[in-house]
């Protein structure tokens, strides 16, 4: 063996020893597989199944694609109260048109949604908190039967969450969900108000402009989003009352079912608010109900552009057994967008078979018929103002 090879050996040996030692001293867990999926087949009284604005009137019988999220995570280190976990997720979507659908076209896509490390117990001043970095679904708030994420600042980022702070827990994060828009997210949660729990949050978003963008006069005004959510346990379920107020790039999402992401279509002179009341309750042994009501207002003084909307929807379920139920989903939406009216309503009936009696039990297979009507326009195939859809869909999460 030459001296050169000896030097290589001595350089590699300590690394190999360290890796081997770590394998024997770290208690790593098994890989966890989590995910979400929906898929099916449908048609309408005028060709293919036609779907529109499910965030306004409901998603049951109003989803025309195959969509899935596949998540892998593993705790790689667990010692002395300190843990490190890595998580990665891919999502994919296809048009549900046929057998072979390559995920490389404009309509069929695959995306990296999560890739992060979460470390707990490593902060001396807050051992209960989690330190994290990477792409992450971050503390998302959603209404399931609408597929509406009304508070969501997910994306690449870093932060600390779950710091014990008086009556609640404090979290802070830096994320980016849109281009060069940096978001600072601050939340204080778990504040007890009688039997209810209050969470408040403030999001600050500001573009990070290049010199060329500055020279071109691009706007970089600070946008703010304030959110308050009061959660109350009722009727073997819960009710949530949400208030949101946004300015600048956070104003426009208040009128179009946006979440916590900055909207570049409006970057100065705007303000808006949104009220949401939603929940899932169990009024009797065989009946469960998911419901939502929303009202939003948007104003743009610079552009003299004002709009408002309201939406109401409900999905009651009657359980015939622990594994079979009947759904009725109804939804109504109306808006006035700077003098232009829009209106949409939907009614869906479905027979479903689920893996258990709970409203949240999945997997589930459902057969549905859905009628959607546009009261002001003709958005459907052939210039029609309404459509009747039929189909079968599965939904699962694990």
From Swiss-Prot:
The record marks 36, 67, 238, 360, 397 as: Greasy slide, important in sugar transport. Its main location: membrane. It comes from the Bacteria. It is a multi-pass membrane protein. Residues 1-30 form the signal peptide. GO terms for molecular function: maltodextrin transmembrane transporter activity; maltose transporting porin activity. Gene3D superfamilies: Porin, LamB type. Induction: By maltose. It holds the Pfam family LamB. One of its GO terms (biological process) is monoatomic ion transport. It is found in: Cell outer membrane. One of its GO terms (cellular component) is pore complex. The keyword Transmembrane applies. Keywords: Cell outer membrane, Ion transport, Membrane, Porin, Signal, Sugar transport, Transmembrane, Transmembrane beta strand, Transport. CDD domains: Maltoporin-like. Involved in the transport of maltose and maltodextrins. PANTHER family: CRYPTIC OUTER MEMBRANE PORIN BGLH-RELATED. Belongs to the porin LamB (TC 1.B.3) family. This is Maltoporin. The lineage of its organism: Bacteria, Pseudomonadati, Pseudomonadota, Gammaproteobacteria, Oceanospirillales. The gene is lamB.
């Amino acid at each position: 063996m030459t001296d050169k090879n000896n030097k290589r050996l001595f350089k590699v040996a300590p690394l190999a020893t360290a890796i081997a030692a770590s394998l024997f001293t770290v208690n790593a867990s098994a890989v966890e597989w989590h995910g979400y999926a929906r898929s099916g087949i449908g048609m309408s009284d005028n060709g293919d199944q036609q779907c529109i604005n499910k965030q306004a009137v409901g998603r049951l019988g109003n989803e025309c694609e195959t969509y899935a999220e596949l998540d892998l995570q593993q705790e790689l280190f667990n010692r002395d109260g300190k843990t490190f976990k890595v998580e990665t997720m891919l999502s994919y979507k296809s048009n549900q048109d046929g057998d072979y659908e390559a995920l490389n076209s404009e309509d069929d896509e695959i995306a990296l949604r999560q890739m992060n490390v979460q470390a707990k117990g490593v902060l001396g001043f807050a051992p209960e908190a989690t330190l994290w970095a990477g792409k992450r679904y971050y503390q998302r708030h959603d209404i399931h039967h609408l597929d509406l994420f009304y508070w969501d600042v997910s994306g690449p980022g870093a932060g600390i969450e779950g710091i014990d702070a008086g009556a609640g827990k404090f979290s802070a994060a830096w994320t980016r969900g849109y281009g060069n828009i940096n978001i600072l997210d601050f939340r204080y949660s778990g504040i007890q108000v009688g039997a209810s729990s209050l969470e408040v949050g403030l999001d600050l978003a500001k573009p990070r402009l290049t010199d060329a963008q500055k020279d071109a006069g691009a706007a970089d005004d600070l946008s703010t989003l304030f959110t308050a959510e009061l959660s109350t346990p009722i009727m073997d379920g819960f009710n949530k009352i949400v208030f949101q107020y946004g300015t600048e790039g956070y104003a426009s999402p208040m009128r179009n079912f946006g979440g916590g992401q900055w909207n570049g279509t409006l970057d100065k002179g705007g303000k808006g608010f949104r009220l949401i009341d939603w929940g899932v309750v169990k009024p009797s042994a065989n009946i469960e109900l998911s419901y939502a009501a929303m009202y939003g207002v948007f104003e743009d003084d610079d552009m003299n552009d004002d709009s408002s909307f309201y939406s109401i929807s409900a999905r009651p379920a009657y359980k015939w057994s622990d594994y079979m139920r009947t759904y009725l989903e109804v939804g109504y939406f109306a808006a006035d967008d700077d003098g232009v009216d829009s209106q949409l309503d939907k009614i869906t009936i479905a027979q479903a078979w689920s893996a258990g009696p709970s409203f949240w039990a999945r997997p589930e297979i459902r057969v549905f018929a859905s009628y959607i009507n546009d009261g002001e326009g003709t958005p459907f195939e052939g210039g029609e103002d309404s459509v009747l859809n039929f189909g079968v869909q599965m939904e699962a999460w694990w």
